[in-house]
Amino acid sequence: MSPSKYLLTPPEELHPLTDSNPQIYPDFDPWIHTKEEDKILKEFVAKGYYTASRVNFETISARSALQGSLPKVSSLLGDELSKIIEIREQEINRISTLDIEDSTRFTKWSGQDFHLPNRVTLTDQKRNLWLQELSSSNTSLRKLTKSVPHGFRKRHILEQCYTQFVPIYRVIWLIKSCYAIEWKGMISKAKGETTHEELLSTLYKDWTDNMVLILEKLVFEVSKYYNDPGQLKYWKLRIAHYLKILGNCYEMELLNRSTLHQWLVDFLSKIESFEFYPMTLHILSIFWSGILGTTEEDTEIESSFLIIKLSEILLRKYHIISESKCMINDSKYIINDVQRNSKLKESVLLRLRQFISHIFHTQSLEAFIMPKQNWNIYKNYLYQILLQNVSDEETPKLKKKLKLISYRNESLRLGSLDVEPSRETSPFSTELTLDNVFSGNILNLKNVSPELLGVLDSGLSGSEWSLFIDQKITKMEQVIEIILWAINPSRKHRYDSCHLVAKILVLKINSQESFQEYSIEDVIWSLIFHFSKLSKLELQKIVWLPKLHQLLNVFIGYGIIKVPTYIRRLISSGVLYLPESENKNFHCKLLINLKISPIMKSQYNMVLKNVMEYAPHFYEKYNFDKLVSIFESLKPKLLSGDFERLEEYPGSIRIMCSEWYLSQICFNQGELQKVNNHKIIKTFQLFCINLGELHHFFGWAEYIVYHQLIDDLENLEVFTDILLYLDKAFLLLINDHILFMKTLLHSYMRDLRIKDKAAFELINFKSFWKFFVKNCANMIEMDSSLQNQIAEVFELERHRKDHFTKMPNETVSLYLEITGNKNTKFEEQNFPSVIQQNIKKVLHNPEDESNCRKLLLLCKASHASEYNKFLSIFVKRGDFTVHELLKLISLKLLSFEVIQKTSHFDLLCELVSQVSFNYGLNFENEKNAFVKRNFKQITLQLFSRPTFRDTLVRMLVEYGPNSNLSEKSAQVVSHILREEKNMSIIRDMLIYGMNIENEAIDNTIDLYRYLNFTNTWLFQILTEFNVKNSNAEDLSDFFSSIVGAIGYNSLLPKIFSNISDKKQVSTLLTVIERQFLARVLETEKSALVFLHIMMDTEIVLSRHLVNMSSLGMDSEVLELFKNTIATFAKMPNDTLKKYDENLNELLKIVIIHEKFILRHCFESIELRDHYMVDNFYTLFHNTGKDLKLKLLLYDLLTSLKSYILNETKDQALHSIKMPSVLNQLPKFAISSFLDSEGTEDEFLDKDEPSLIRLGICDKQAKTNSALKYFVFNKKSSQFDCIFKIEPFQYLVNYQEPLEGELNNTSLSLGLFDARLEKTNPS
């Protein structure tokens, strides 16, 4: 007998003796007891303590205690019997309740009899108590399964299971039970009206939807616990447990896998905050193999679509994170931890790289087929991911795959024809020679980027430039394009062009895929030497020399180029030693206009000395010592404020003056001096007008703002007007916009506000605040305090609008404050007389100008309509000079709209032709804004007045290229051409800013000699005008004349882009196609250039026809096209290879006329004429490995096959037979172009991401748990249908069997002697 059964244990309530009691006999000392001791004495000592015996009497046998009871022995026998039955069923192939290879089971034996648990109705409290017992492993599952609470909702069950950490096997049992109960209920309700498959589909979908909903909620909860480590740890435990639940349901097929896959991909797509990326990617890795491993035939298309979608999403996320500067969003970090940020960013990018690489190496290449606009963005990233850390042996294979994908994404299909140069060889190209860039004339670029030119003319906000530069500026010839744009005479009004080009180059140098600095410098100096070789007339047409000098000096300031490098190249070129060379003059003029430092003195003087024999004045007037002497003589002049004729000095002297004067006014004045209106305007004129050093003005602007030297609101108004006038340069040249604006707003709201209440209430800065918010929105988002300041000023401006109309007392108090006369009653004042008197004082009494202006602004704010009426009368009277009106506009007392309403257009034309900075820059700002709003009306009024011809031309040239005004510009120029009936306006616009005599050009075609990428917009207008006014017969001659005048110019397609008339387009297409087909069999380089340009022109023209099905083909052209196709089809393979480029261009005609040609082929097939189809098929087989060509032909043949199938749906056309060549067309994929030795198998297991299976048993070889069984009909000896047991019908039975309750699956089949056999019924 075990002694443990009779081991005495002390009672729990008895307190043990402690060592603190003295170790003496208690009999010798009196007993001092406590109340507690009395209680112990009564309960235990008095009554005694004993343990009851296990048997009734000591005399009874102890056999039952020593040996196990009969029920226990019976239970053991039952377990062994169950094992015997299991073995017997498996051996003799009876219906098995357990499949040997089915590892999704949790127990070895479930029994044949199956009984759903009884459902009982419980209160919410008892239901939760039942779930708590389920989560406890101490509670027997057999006890719990006798009854299941009724009314559990799916979401409630799942939430309780992960919050209470119910063991996984119990969760699975509960989910299976709920599945089975719901399934049984659904069958009884359906009554045979709904199929079994539909019921199961609904059941699985409902549960899966709830599962993913909870998972989404759990992922988003992470943001709540960032600052609470305890809650964050608990959240991790909960989501880990839930993922184990979900993972087991996924493996056991207790959810709809395709729904989960679709949700996961969509969820990854929609998350934007970086804080959710790690967990989302972790979840994706868990189910990664499932998403990629779908192989069922019925879901193959769906899975393929999902993988394509997933690939694009992963590339998009990679692009977003790569471009992001900060991944951390934590309130604890005022300045983000750089190391932590970079580590997190690299970790996420690494996981994304693993996913993308795994898809690339294990899936079909079609996974990366995407819309062209997306491909242009993600292409570079895919190259970067896949070619990183790749051995030299694998690189060619990877590049071939990438080339295939690139060809497919860029293949020419209907609606996606592209006239841009192809870039499939490499994402970036930085090495070039000028011969590769120019074709003939220096501005005749072989490749022009219209998008780049449009952005340069129209502008982007500061934050958009980085993204645009990374994506769009990928070739070195684009650097030449933007330089030529900046120095072109037609862009000389762009004061910011030099700094804009410099910023683009600096951003490109610092970008991930950067150009090397030495490469850029080499291209710039090569371009300068190219300019020196041009004649004087050619140079005047393409370069405005002051802007070229300014651009190079800006480059020098940014460190993009270096003058010593230029001098060394100049000496080594030998130009200085040529007798009487114009090159020397060009280089010497350039050198004396560059920034020269004292350390370059000897080199600089040496160059000038070398030309003394032919041009001695360069050294005599501009040697370095002479430059310093002139600079020293100008210092007193600058300090006295005499800035006249400074612009006549060479650029080197102007730079010296600008740098010295900036240091003088900022650092050498001793005590800080406040600035006034006069000082601000004069400094602007000096730096921006006389010296042309914009960046020095903005350096001074930062200085006076940070030192708070503007102590008057009127001065601040003048200052902000200048910043608005230089809006583009403000975005480029202010170093820290946030700090600048915060300081400016602080001065405005805290200091200046209390100094002059009247000025604060009357002077409006709303236009400047709006400008900043519009162009610097991303900067405002980065700083919460700046957001609050901006919100505060906008709220103030909003209240100011109705301030005076709703509060007349405020008007009176301000009036008394301005006048300083407390006895004056505002109500007694005559409103018109107040305006009239103060206008006179403003115009003629400078000492009273400030107060009078405030009174007029008060009148305007309190009685706006009466004020404007009086000014309209004032303008109609004409008692003023233009200079006086200009001053009123500058002081914001008069608007252009008031003059416009009086129909005083002569006066309006006079004003818009004026340029004035004497009273600030508000006049220029108002004029520019007014012209943009009324561009068409103003230009037409200027046209009707010949005296303003120069103003008209200047306005058309300056505003015409702007995309927002392009349509109005076209209308105005077309109107002028119709009215004048000659080309004089075009001629004037073409030579604007060139400083050359107006050449007499009577022939329209001669004007096309001036065509270049900077004036393409003007020739688009001219071409559209001429085409509209030409008949069909003249169009052919007109097109041929243009081609003859400009040669094979890549701009030819662009000048026809505005033509949209259907008849004119069709006529031009016929003309182009005839010329194209006449030379398509020529292989000379010039012929290929001609074919390329002709086809690009046809593509541009065809885009204007929305309904391409109506775009027919001339019968003569069609026959010529068919004969040409037949000629190519008859060529041997070796010969055909020489014509790949010709054939590529030819097939674009098929795309343009696709529906027409498909219809023609179909009609030919009706007449049993397969000649053209056979020729296309022959070409498809003979083109070899020309991937792009093969894709085009395959697309054509598949389109033709689809067209025939669609047309023959009608019963009447069933007699038409599909051509045999189309039936033989193979199933085609882009991976078909891979060579046999470069198959995808080599990359099958490469870069597979480490997958985390939370709580899921890993298997050596995954088996499909959904085994296919078939019901066998013994009478017919055939398999009738597939039989499948659903996963939830494998529910473990823990209950006692009830009579009459039998499982409706396994045992029911057993009664009919059915068997589950894994045999193929076929």
Swiss-Prot record:
Keywords: Activator, Nucleus, Repressor, Transcription, Transcription regulation. Residues 1-21 are annotated as: Disordered. It holds the Pfam family Med12. One of its GO terms (cellular component) is mediator complex. It comes from the Eukaryota. Signal peptide: none annotated. GO terms for biological process: regulation of transcription by RNA polymerase II. SMART domains: Med12 (SM01281). It is found in: Nucleus. One of its GO terms (molecular function) is transcription coregulator activity. Belongs to the Mediator complex subunit 12 family. Component of the SRB8-11 complex. The SRB8-11 complex is a regulatory module of the Mediator complex which is itself involved in regulation of basal and activated RNA polymerase II-dependent transcription. The SRB8-11 complex may be involved in the transcriptional repression of a subset of genes regulated by Mediator. It may inhibit the association of the Mediator complex with RNA polymerase II to form the holoenzyme complex. Component of the SRB8-11 complex, which itself associates with the Mediator complex. This is Mediator of RNA polymerase II transcription subunit 12. It comes from Kluyveromyces lactis (strain ATCC 8585 / CBS 2359 / DSM 70799 / NBRC 1267 / NRRL Y-1140 / WM37).
